[in-house]
Amino acid sequence: CGGSQDNVDGVEPSSNNLDTTTSAQDTTSTTANTVVEESTTTIVQDTTTTTILKNHCDNCEYVSIGELNANINNVPKFAWNDYQRIYDENIKFENETFEIILNIGPSTDLYFLDNEQYLQKGINFWQNFALPDKYYGFFYNYTDLDWAINELNSSGFEGDMARAPCRDGVCSGANSGIYQRPPHFGVGTFGINSSDSIDKYRYGPLHIHEVTHSVVAAQWIGIARNPQQSANDASPCWLNEGIAHAAGLSLGVGTYEEYLDIRSSQVTGRHIRAPFNDYSPSTILKYYNESIPGICIKNPDYVLGYSIGYLTVEAMNAMAGADSAMHMYSVMASGKDFEEAFELTYEISWNDAKPIFAEYVSSVISDLFNS
């Protein structure tokens, strides 16, 4: 989800069949026993255990959780490099069956024309995981809101989903997920507002962020009656937005220098007013503890997923690979809860890891605000 930088409140998730999480911020079943690319991870499952087979990448640089603070300047580089590595491997075998259908409002003037290209880039990165068969993207301004409602209805979705990115006469946010009813297509609504055209986040990172939300929920396709709801019920909110934002920012820009710039602006450019301006380790730890799956979606601090959650996932990526969090979602879809899946993926309990992450993320945010 994405949206306007001016608004620090989260857009309430709609009560329709696409119960995804969104924020009005700018800047905004994986198949067991499936062998994927040599440099990615896979899951092997029997009747009693679930085992994560680690990434095989002899030339990659990773850090252990205990090395995070000593490598505060290397963590973003290691994580960003791994996104590029996996993407470069995946495009050798591009998924040619996935279909993207774009619908653009009749009076909507797009300031960015590569929408499909960046949605596809997100899909290419995640192509070793369970995917929906199709992704529908609806792009519209407020004038075209009624059009969007009708288009969603005629495409088999619920028209009211079109309202999610809109507020106070402006459509500026974004919202994506997996539709409740079979065949569980991915669907995203993208508000278009000309004043957003100055925002670099809107030129690719947003699209990858949004399609990542759909891929997360797709891990429950074929497993749960309502994959999106099951994903929401399984995931802490910091992780839900963290995985999407880390992918969007890392894959949506062309160079590491651009990544560092947008990383800094995303973390420092939002929720800097109380109560969202305290990034002490104790406050971050409290945020982790209150990010309870199935409940946290309504929390007023949901927006912290775009900073604290994002930086936490970036650290996880530097520890175990840029696709490691999606592997964790695959484990959750197989029946494990978040804490079980986290320990299987990162070889440390969440209870032991979270105070270390809190210290690290606090230091990163302090550095970004003071640089």
Labelled PLM ranges:
Residues 167-272:
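Zinc-dependent metallopeptidase catalytic helix centered on the HExxH motif
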